[in-house]
């Protein structure tokens, strides 16, 4: 079995544009073709000038394989090219430097409700209750992740986690790693450091939240319990922070026309998400 080494830079485009790195193998047939990731490439074809042949006893003077079956070893170079983030935010001049998104996850305009999520889940669904909740074994006292109280965990389970991991964060998963669901502290800061004005924007009721001459609009997007969406112009916005005294609760922002509070709510319920990021100044 003959061998020849070659270098290929492979560009993959996904949510992030990446170059991957690995040592992998492909088979070259008797006609001098190599199959790489199911793509047949001629030996004398230089792909973006990144394919290189090394002179060895298995390669002729021109740098090409002459005959026989060979095993080809090639490398894929690793690099990260971040895709441009198109999600808009507002700098309200908050002490923490937190930047708030202009619309909810799943929305296309500030007045749209967007998607509803159970806490720690990253896709919307039809029914929001304990039987469909990802992080329990069918009941509120059988948590399987994010549990600090043994009587609320499945068979006494605890893991000490009080904030969502990025892979369970609806903002990070649906937008990018630059975004997070807000912490309880970030919600408290928004609630106490800004002016909240109940208003109607493009026919949708909600709060205009203002500071430093700038503002965001939070629609009263309601919330799901089971398959029922609440009514009454209410707002339920998840934080990424677990409840303090009940591991089956998580902290959230709750409001109606005359009150804005930070409370805790059953994790299985469906609430909206307004993402945050931290200023890079």
Predicted regions and their residues:
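C-terminal, surface-exposed recognition/capping segments
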Residues: 84-281
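Cellulosome-associated attachment modules in secreted, modular CAZymes
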Residues: 5-84
């Amino acid at each position: 079995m003959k061998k020849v080494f070659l270098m290929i830079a492979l560009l993959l485009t996904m949510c992030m544009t990446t170059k991957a790195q690995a040592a992998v193998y492909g088979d070259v047939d008797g006609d001098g073709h190599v199959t790489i990731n199911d793509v047949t490439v001629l030996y004398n074809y230089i792909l973006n000038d990144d394919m290189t042949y090394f002179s060895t006893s298995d390669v002729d003077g021109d740098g090409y394989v002459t005959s026989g079956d060979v095993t080809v070893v090639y490398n894929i170079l690793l690099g990260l090219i971040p895709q441009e983030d198109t999600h808009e935010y507002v700098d309200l001049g908050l002490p923490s430097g937190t930047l708030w998104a202009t619309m909810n996850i799943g929305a296309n305009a500030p007045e749209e409700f967007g998607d509803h999520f159970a806490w720690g889940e990253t896709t919307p669904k039809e029914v929001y209750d304990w039987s469909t909740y990802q992080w329990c074994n069918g009941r509120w006292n059988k948590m399987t992740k994010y549990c600090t109280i043994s009587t609320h965990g499945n068979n006494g389970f605890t893991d000490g986690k009080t904030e969502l991991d990025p892979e369970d964060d609806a903002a990070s998963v649906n937008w990018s790693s630059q975004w997070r669901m807000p912490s309880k502290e970030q919600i408290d800061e928004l609630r106490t450091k800004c002016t909240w004005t109940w208003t109607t924007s493009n026919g949708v009721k909600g709060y205009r939240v203002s500071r430093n001459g700038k503002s965001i609009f939070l629609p009263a997007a309601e919330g799901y319990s089971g398959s029922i969406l609440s009514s009454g112009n209410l707002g339920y916005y998840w934080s990424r922070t677990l409840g303090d005294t009940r591991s089956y609760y998580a902290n959230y922002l709750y409001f109606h026309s005359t009150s804005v509070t930070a409370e805790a709510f059953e994790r299985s319920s469906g609430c909206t998400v307004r993402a945050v990021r931290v200023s890079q100044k």
